Amino acid sequence: MSTDSLFHRDLYAGQMAEQLLNPGPLDESTRSGVFLSGIRRVGKTTFLRQDLIPALESRGALVIYVDLWADPAKSPSALVHEAVRQTLLQLQTPGSALLKRLRGLRLGAAGLSLDIELDRLGEPGGSTLAQAFEALVAKTKTNVVLIIDEVQQTLGTDEGQALLHALKAARDAVNAKPGT
């Protein structure tokens, strides 16, 4: 489908982005996560990728997107850890497109330096998602939004449940810090 035939929902995406990044007193629960649901084939993924992500990024958020249907041979946990790892590697790579987009953060020409072990992210004895997100938010001092498309793929397996617990721990670790 060409992007010309899409029905963009820019206003809705902008309102949602604003509510997520700057929640009012009645919106504080959005800091715990938001689920977008609906019947199949109505444009949820298109909305996320074409409207919401650009709206979040235009407001300075660092967005990590992962589609759990992207590679059915990989577990949801592996896909999420890979997406986080790849984003962090891009931020550590001098001259990367992501680093350039975030140039207003004064991360330096050499890239972002994180004190975590990326090659073992999510593995036993390696860095956790909580450690990765804490370090990322502390270094960038910007909103980080993790979008997991087809999150229902995590349900029904022990590994999927463990991933959801790890994501909750990461959310709690970041949200517990003052000013985040």
Where are the model-predicted features located?
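Short, structured helix-loop boundary elements
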Residues: D10-A13, S77, G126, L164
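Generic hydrophobic alpha-helical segments
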Residues: Y12-P23, L129-L136, L167
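Alpha-helix termini
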Residues: L21-S29, L56-S58, E134-T140, R171-P178
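P-loop NTPase nucleotide-binding core
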Residues: S32-G160
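Sensor-1/coupling segment of RecA-like P-loop NTPase cores
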Residues: Q153-T154, D158-T180
